[in-house]
């Protein structure tokens, strides 16, 4: 039991730096869910890595988000650890970076759009799609949208 507590706390500490922490806050604000529990191993794309065909609308949100992070990485940004500023006022998320062309703003937009996608499809959330082993995902993946 002590090992499980240690592992959980370590995972929480590792993933609270930079934009991953802010992304979690956005998801929590819009869905009321704790992303470390609700989205970390959801479907074929939510959480670290991803391949195969998305299982549902929530998983599609994650696939599109992975593609967005891929574009950020390809352009020299670090979407996992680059902090950014955002506001949440009257149930509205806004990226508030002053440099609208810089990495922080673009990464924030990736996270904001994914969080809104989760909110829009929250009624379809299916806890049976949580699977750390990602069974049934296959190898054929959809192309990233432009």
Swiss-Prot record:
GO terms for cellular component: extracellular region. Keywords: Calcium, Disulfide bond, Glycoprotein, Hydrolase, Lipid degradation, Lipid metabolism, Metal-binding, Secreted, Signal. It holds the Pfam family Phospholip_A2_1. PROSITE patterns: PA2_ASP, PA2_HIS. One of its GO terms (biological process) is glycerophospholipid catabolic process. InterPro entries: PLipase_A2, PLipase_A2_Asp_AS, PLipase_A2_dom, PLipase_A2_dom_sf, PLipase_A2_His_AS. The active site is at 65, 111. Residues 1-18 form the signal peptide. Its main location: secreted. Ca(2+) binds at residues 45, 47, 49, 66. Glycans are attached at residues 85, 126. Expressed by the skin glands (at protein level). It is found in: Secreted. It is an enzyme of class 3 (hydrolase). The keyword Cell division does not apply. It catalyses: a 1,2-diacyl-sn-glycero-3-phosphocholine + H2O = a 1-acyl-sn-glycero-3-phosphocholine + a fatty acid + H(+). GO terms for molecular function: calcium ion binding; calcium-dependent phospholipase A2 activity; phospholipid binding. It comes from the Eukaryota. Disulfide bonds join 44-137, 46-62, 61-117, 67-144, 68-110, 77-103, 95-108. Its cofactor is Ca(2+). N-glycosylated. Glycosylated with mannose chains including Man2(GlcNAc), Man2(GlcNAc)2, Man2(GlcNAc)3, Man2(GlcNAc)4 and Man2(GlcNAc)5. PLA2 catalyzes the calcium-dependent hydrolysis of the 2-acyl groups in 3-sn-phosphoglycerides. Belongs to the phospholipase A2 family. This is Phospholipase A2. It comes from Pithecopus azureus (Orange-legged monkey tree frog).
């Amino acid at each position: 039991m002590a090992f499980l507590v240690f592992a959980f706390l370590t995972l929480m500490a590792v993933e609270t730096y930079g934009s991953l922490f802010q992304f979690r806050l956005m998801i929590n604000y819009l869905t009321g869910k704790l992303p470390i529990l609700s989205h970390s191993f959801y479907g074929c794309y939510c959480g670290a890595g991803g391949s195969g065909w998305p299982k549902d609308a929530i998983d599609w949100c994650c696939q599109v988000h992975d593609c967005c992070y891929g574009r950020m990485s390809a352009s020299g940004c670090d979407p996992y650890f680059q902090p950014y500023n955002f506001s949440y006022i009257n149930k509205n998320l806004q990226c508030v970076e002053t440099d609208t062309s810089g990495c922080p703003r673009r990464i924030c937009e990736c996270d904001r759009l994914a969080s809104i996608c989760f909110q829009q499809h929250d009624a379809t959330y299916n806890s049976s799609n949580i699977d750390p082993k990602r069974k049934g995902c296959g190898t054929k993946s959809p192309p990233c949208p432009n």
